[in-house]
Design a protein with these regions (language model features):
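N-terminal intrinsically disordered, cationic/polar leader segments
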Residues: 2-164
Length: 164
């Protein structure tokens, strides 16, 4: 069996899980998330634990088993604790401003870059004198947060020699 897949997911207090027709819905104090699950993988909720099982030991089933177990575990952690990421803008004259769901970045180009953040993400920008500006983003969905952080990083990749 998959090492990741065979471990049960323990539910923290205040987290509800509903499984119906290949859809797993997780609801907690920070929000709610849902994930479609492949028809071959079964998800069961028993006395405070979630068990993910597969029908056979085929390679496809093994890979899906660990994948869905990890995705559901990330959902449970997200709705109970949430996810947070910090990005530091290293460069001369780099700035970040957050106005509602609009993120305005000054990254050394001739123009400012404006990004509309998804509604689920809460962002703040801090700039202390004498240090690099920091962008702090929080969200319940780990995948969405990672995609937005990667998009922001791709706008101005670090220089390969010093990493700035």
């Amino acid at each position: 069996m998959s090492r990741v897949g065979k471990m049960p997911i323990t539910l923290p207090a205040g987290v509800e899980v509903n499984v119906s027709q290949g859809l797993v819905k997780v609801k907690g104090k920070k929000g709610s998330l849902e994930q479609k699950v492949d028809s071959d993988i079964t998800v069961k909720v028993d006395n405070g634990e979630i068990h993910v099982t597969r029908p056979t030991d085929q390679k496809r089933h093994k890979s899906l088993h660990g994948l869905y177990r990890a995705l559901i575990a990330n959902m449970v952690r997200g709705v109970s604790e949430g996810y947070k990421t910090e990005q530091e803008l290293v460069g001369v004259g780099y700035r970040a401003n957050v106005k509602g769901q609009l993120l305005e970045l000054s990254l050394g180009y001739s123009h400012n870059i404006v990004i509309e953040l998804p509604q689920e993400i809460k962002a703040t920008a801090t700039a202390e004198k004498g240090s690099n500006p920091k962008l702090i983003m929080e969200c319940v969905d780990n995948q969405l947060l990672g995609m937005v952080a990667a998009k922001i990083r791709s706008l101005r990749k670090p220089e390969p020699y010093k990493g700035k």
